[in-house]
């Protein structure tokens, strides 16, 4: 494993569990109706809804006769997405993460949910995945590509392991789309890098970048959407709860003092999203037959 990727693995090994008060076993953003007032009571439902909305947007059928037979979650975290999809669709799900601690947690979680025979997790590099070409009917990633240096290679690997006709789903934090010749303002670039540093991410790109990297590959029906308004309702809740005694101690006890950087990053994320310099991009396509 390259040194850069080892640092990502180390980060996740140290902060795994720090945010489970808000996300449970789903280390990704939730989906809210714009203008919703997020509460702790609905935050778990929102992360589940995000999975459903992404699959729906990508055209993944729930019809038993047309449903996928297998799914790969790239950057599978604590295993929440794989376990949920395996149960909902009654299919085989595989997760890959660079964090050994997350693999162990995910395996234990799958066992407690009774789907250990339908779900498996591998510790590996998303830039060089240990899977054969055309293996999976759905290839899914959310809030992962931000942590990868070579994002174009990441996408090529996703497409490589996707079966003909497979849905390919990419969802991530992103910067705004830019016109030809346009670049991020130095101030905005600095703010986004501070967010990345606090969240253990490497860099952000735009949804146009994802589309540009997918276009020369054997992928059709490429479409993109901006779901920023659907994730921002959570930010006020995160800022409020993270500074309660319960929230603060949960984050520090489970994630260590390094997790404090995540709290600071939340402040920046909320403001950047409000100012329009941070987006939540969704891009999907279908592997050509």
UniProtKB/Swiss-Prot annotation:
InterPro entries the UniProt entry points to: Erg6_SMT_methyltransf, Methyltransf_11, MTs_g-TMT, SAM-dependent_MTases_sf
Main location: other
Alphabetically ordered keywords of this record: Alkaloid metabolism, Methyltransferase, Peroxisome, S-adenosyl-L-methionine, Thylakoid, Transferase
Family annotation (CDD domains): AdoMet_MTases
Localization, UniProt: Thylakoid; Peroxisome
Stimuli inducing this protein: Up-regulated upon methyl jasmonate treatment.
EC number, UniProt record: 2.1.1.99
Motif (Microbody targeting signal) on chain: 287-289
Regulation affecting activity: Inhibited by gamma-tocopherol.
Enzyme class: transferase
Catalytic reactions of this protein: (3R)-3-hydroxy-16-methoxy-2,3-dihydrotabersonine + S-adenosyl-L-methionine = deacetoxyvindoline + S-adenosyl-L-homocysteine + H(+)
GO terms, molecular function: 16-methoxy-2,3-dihydro-3-hydroxytabersonine N-methyltransferase activity; N-methyltransferase activity
Tissue specificity: Mainly expressed in young leaves, and, to a lower extent, in mature leaves, flowers, stems and roots (at protein level).
GO biological process: alkaloid metabolic process; methylation
Gene Ontology CC entries for this record: peroxisome; thylakoid
Region feature (SAM motif III): 161-170
Region (SAM motif I), start-end ranges: 71-80
Record Pfam families: Methyltransf_11
Residue segments, region SAM motif II: 134-142
Pathway membership: Alkaloid biosynthesis; vindoline biosynthesis
Family membership: Belongs to the class I-like SAM-binding methyltransferase superfamily. gTMT family.
Free-text function comment from the UniProt entry: S-adenosyl-L-methionine-dependent N-methyltransferase that catalyzes a nitrogen methylation involved in vindoline biosynthesis. Displays a strict requirement for a 2,3-dihydro bond in the aspidosperma skeleton. Can use 2,3-dihydrotabersonine, 2,3-dihydro-3-hydroxytabersonine and 2,3,6,7-tetraydro-3-hydroxytabersonine as substrates, but not tabersonine, vincadifformine, 21-hydroxycyclolochnericine, tryptamine, norharmane, harmaline, catharanthine, norajmaline, ajmaline, serpentine, ajmalicine, yohimbine or gamma-tocopherol. Inactive with picrinine as substrate.
Subunit comment: Homodimer.
Protein name (record): 3-hydroxy-16-methoxy-2,3-dihydrotabersonine N-methyltransferase
Species of the source: Catharanthus roseus (Madagascar periwinkle)
Lineage: Eukaryota, Viridiplantae, Streptophyta, Embryophyta, Tracheophyta
């Amino acid at each position: 494993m390259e040194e850069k990727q080892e640092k990502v693995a180390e980060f996740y090994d140290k902060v795994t569990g720090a945010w489970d008060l808000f996300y449970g076993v789903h280390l990704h953003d939730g989906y809210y109706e714009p203008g919703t007032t997020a509460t702790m009571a609905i935050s778990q439902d929102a992360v589940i809804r995000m999975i459903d909305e992404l699959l729906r947007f990508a055209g993944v059928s729930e019809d038993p006769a047309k449903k996928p037979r297998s799914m790969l979650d790239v950057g599978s975290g604590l295993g929440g997405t794989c376990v949920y999809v395996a149960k909902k669709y009654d299919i085989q799900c595989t997760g890959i993460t660079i964090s050994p601690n997350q693999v162990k947690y995910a395996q234990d979680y799958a066992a407690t949910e009774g789907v250990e025979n339908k779900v498996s997790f591998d510790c590996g590099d998303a830039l060089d995945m240990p899977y054969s070409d055309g293996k999976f009917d759905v290839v899914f990633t959310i809030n992962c590509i931000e942590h990868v240096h070579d994002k174009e290679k990441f996408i090529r690997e996703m497409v490589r392991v996707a079966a003909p006709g497979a849905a390919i789903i990419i969802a991530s934090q992103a910067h705004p789309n830019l016109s030809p010749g346009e670049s991020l303002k130095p101030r905005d670039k600095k703010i986004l890098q501070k967010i990345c540093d606090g969240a253990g991410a490497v860099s952000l790109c735009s949804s146009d970048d994802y589309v540009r990297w997918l276009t020369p590959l054997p992928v059709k029906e490429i479409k993109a959407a901006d779901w920023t308004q659907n994730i921002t309702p959570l930010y006020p809740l995160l800022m409020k709860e993270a500074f309660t005694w319960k929230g603060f101690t949960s984050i520090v006890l489970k994630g260590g003092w390094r997790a404090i950087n995540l709290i600071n990053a939340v402040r920046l994320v909320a403001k950047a999203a409000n100012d329009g310099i941070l987006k939540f991009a969704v891009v999907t396509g279908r592997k050509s037959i």
